[in-house]
């Protein structure tokens, strides 16, 4: 679990790669993916599920990707909005994407974490 949403739902971060040597993992480039920024983007759940399934497959294509990259995946970035049946907004009726840094730091736990993670993996 990466953090909790404003309503206490888990915001998960999956890390998928191959290699038992931590130093080698830290040298790999990171590919960051997320889904359900806007709750109504239902198709993104199917896409991210397919990507995860593909990466966990034993095909030579997925093995090559995992050998060369670390995948960081947040399958559902706005779990509160999804649970409430919102189309675009979060728990408070606010736009979860593209908020100012001030707003993110003060009020939006999941977005603060998301933007911080993007900053860290640059």
Predicted regions and their residues:
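Active-site/substrate-binding loop(s) of hydrolase catalytic cores
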Residues: 2-122
